[in-house]
């Protein structure tokens, strides 16, 4: 029954809408080939909910996932392996050394590639206990367990961990559960348990960035969190879209970047395509009506953008 439910859900996502063509006015990027200006923060979208942030010669990654396993492998619980060719392609757009990888929760589309990326970039993992135990199960122990309220300075970055939640899919919470100790490296999608969802406030060079993969809870954020320069907010499912306006009102961002809305079964080389369960016209509507005054933007794969 669970497998059937997974298949029905992922089949519905696999059907896709158009790409960015009709929204080209919202797509922002630095001029091609331009170098980052010292003292700025640059953002590169890596696909799904993956991002690279750069400041003062340092890099930070959030939820990097390049393998983009196929629909049938997920739905029928086949063995998942990181695709080293696709990881190599993705890492061509990432600095060779990374200070840390932050993970918002432990599902495969956020964590599967992290062991290989940690090995190649010498990064450490900052994540919840389940994610760290899964990484230790795969032979990686360069990790730091965090929970909401945690703060840490790493290089130019100041990182604050905030509470979050995961969207429900037709009332169902996918692959729920935690992992309290290391064991066997996960083999299939359902082995990558949800764990402890979290959001991050990242500060560097005078800029403040809020990152969540979706499901931002309706809680009052600490006063020192807002306002932010950029809010990256997952909008893959109706749950998070229903809360989007309230989240924006709490965060008071200059820029809003909707995230986790691409077809993550399709390789990035094929270009950005919206997943079928997304509703970008609905996301865009209150901005068009000037009901939300923040600037709505989109980022395309691997095209860096410097936060003004």
Please tell me what each predicted stretch does:
Residues 71-72, 89-152, 157-174:
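Active-site HxH/HxHxD metal-binding segment of metal-dependent hydrolases
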Residues 36-41, 54-60, 151-160, 203-209:
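Beta-strand-turn-beta hairpins that frame and shape the catalytic cleft
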Residues 28-36, 58-102, 107, 115-116, ...:
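Pre-active-site segment of Zn-dependent metallo-hydrolases
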Residues 182-250:
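Active-site-proximal loop/helix segments of hydrolase catalytic cores
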Residues 1-9:
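Sec-dependent signal peptide recognition
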Residues 49, 69, 106-111, 132-135, ...:
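Active-site environment of divalent metal-dependent phosphoester hydrolases
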Residues 136-151, 249, 254-308:
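Binuclear metal-ion centers of metallo-dependent hydrolases, dominated by the metallo-beta-lactamase
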Residues 62-63, 97-107, 126-128, 210-215, ...:
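Active-site neighborhood of phospho(di)ester-bond hydrolases with catalytic His/Asp-centered motifs
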């Amino acid at each position: 029954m669970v497998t059937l439910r997974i298949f029905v859900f992922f089949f519905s996502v696999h059907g896709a809408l158009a790409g960015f063509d009709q929204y080209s006015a919202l797509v922002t990027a630095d001029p091609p080939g331009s170098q980052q200006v010292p003292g700025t923060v640059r953002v590169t979208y890596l696909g799904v909910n993956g991002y690279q942030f750069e400041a003062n010669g340092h890099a930070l990654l959030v939820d990097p996932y390049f393998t983009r396993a196929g629909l049938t492998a997920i739905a029928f619980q086949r063995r998942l392996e990181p695709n080293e060719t696709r990881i190599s392609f993705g890492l061509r757009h990432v600095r060779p050394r990374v200070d840390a990888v932050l993970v918002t929760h432990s599902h495969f589309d956020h964590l599967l590639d992290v062991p290989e990326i940690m090995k190649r970039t010498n990064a450490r993992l900052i994540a919840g206990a389940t994610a760290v135990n899964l990484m230790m199960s795969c032979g990686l122990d360069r990790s730091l367990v965090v929970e909401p309220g945690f703060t840490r300075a790493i290089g130019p970055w100041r990182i604050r961990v905030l509470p979050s939640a995961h969207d429900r899919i037709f009332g169902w919470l996918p692959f729920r559960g935690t992992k309290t100790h290391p064991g066997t490296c996960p083999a299939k999608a359902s082995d990558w348990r949800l764990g402890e969802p979290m959001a991050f406030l990242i500060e560097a060079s005078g800029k403040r960035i809020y990152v969540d993969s979706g499901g931002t809870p309706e809680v009052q954020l600490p006063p020192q969190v807002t306002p932010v320069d950029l809010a990256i907010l997952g909008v893959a499912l109706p749950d998070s879209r229903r809360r989007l306006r309230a989240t924006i009102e709490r965060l008071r961002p200059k820029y809003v970047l909707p995230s986790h809305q691409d077809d993550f079964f399709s390789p990035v080389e094929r270009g950005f395509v919206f997943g079928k369960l997304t509703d970008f016209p609905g996301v865009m509507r209150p901005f068009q009506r000037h009901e939300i005054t923040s600037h709505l933007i989109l980022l395309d794969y691997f095209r860096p953008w410097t936060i003004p």
